Amino acid sequence: MYPAHLLVLSAVCVSLLGAANIPPHPLNLINFMEMIRYTIPCEKTWGEYTNYGCYCGAGGSGRPIDALDRCCYVHDNCYGDAANIRDCNPKTQSYSYKLTKRTIICYGAAGTCARVVCDCDRTAALCFGDSEYIEGHKNIDTARFCQ
């Protein structure tokens, strides 16, 4: 093997080792993003729904500021309820679902962690699709508006 080949091979191995330390997105988050993309208007991206209002994004406090923020509030509470199911972590729980005819179908036995989490995400995604997106409610001053 030529020295140049060894150098390239070494670089590839180092790159792969570095990539192995990057934590993957939980499958649940990917599923939820796909549901949101399926239900929201084409001109919006799922990312526009993070840091919206008082509850869309990490955490939440105060009263929801509009219908869309209320979707996130209900979703947060739904995840809280799901977390009470034995061995259930809603943020990492995988589940099965189907996107069809402008709706979302969740599979699995009723009451199981997977089904409850899927239903939480389904309800929120459909709610996003039915709620008005107000540009001025993105990246609001939560210390001021969410008490």
Curated annotation (Swiss-Prot):
Key word Lipid metabolism present: yes
Tissues/organs with expression:
Expressed by the venom gland.
Q: How is the cofactor bound?
A: Binds 1 Ca(2+) ion.
Q: Where is the signal peptide?
A: 1-19
The catalytic activity, as recorded, is: a 1,2-diacyl-sn-glycero-3-phosphocholine + H2O = a 1-acyl-sn-glycero-3-phosphocholine + a fatty acid + H(+)
What is the source species? Answer: Bungarus multicinctus
Q: Which family does it belong to?
A: Belongs to the phospholipase A2 family. Group I subfamily. D49 sub-subfamily.
Task: Show the GO cellular component annotation of the record.
Answer: extracellular region
- PANTHER family recorded: PHOSPHOLIPASE A2, PHOSPHOLIPASE A2 FAMILY MEMBER
Essential cofactor(s): Ca(2+)
What name has this protein been given in UniProt?
A: Acidic phospholipase A2 beta-bungarotoxin A3 chain
